[in-house]
Amino acid sequence: MKVTIVGAGNVGATAADVIASKEIAENVVLLDIKEGFAEGKALDLMQTASTKGFDSVITGTTGDYSLTEGSDVVVITSGIPRKPGMTREELIGINANIVKDVSENILEYTPNPIIVMVSNPMDTMTYLALKSTGLDPKRVIGMGGALDSSRFKTY
C-alpha cells in the first residue's frame, strides 16, 4: 500500500510516523510546499526505522506530485491554522484554495484514491474535495470527528 500525506507540519509528520511505524503502508510520501521541509521530516522519520523496527519507506518532496502516483490513500493536512481574530469565513476562503489545488494535483497522478481530509474547517474542506474531485462519496472521508472524540476522552 502507498499513502501520501500532503502537509508535513505536526499533524502530517505524526501521521507519517504512525503509518510507517505500524507498517500500515510500505511507502509513505510526505509532500509540502515549503522548500526542504518534507524532505527533512522524512529523513528524521526514516532514521528512527532501525530503533522502531519498521521497513516502510518515507519519502519527502517539495511540491513534486509525480511522487504521489499510485497512492491508495491521500491524507490532506495542508492549510493554514486559524489565527486570532480570523473569522471562519476567512479561514474557509484561504484553505479552500489550498485544498482545491491539492485535490486537482493529486488526481493528475492518482485518479481514484481514498482521500482522508484533516484540513480545517474539516467538514467544509471534505465537501470541497468531494465536489472538486468528482470521486465517489465513499472515497472522501473527513477525519475531524475522531480527533474531537479522542480529545474529549482525554479530559
What are these regions (language model features)?
Residues M1-V3:
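Extreme N-terminal starter segment of soluble prokaryotic enzymes
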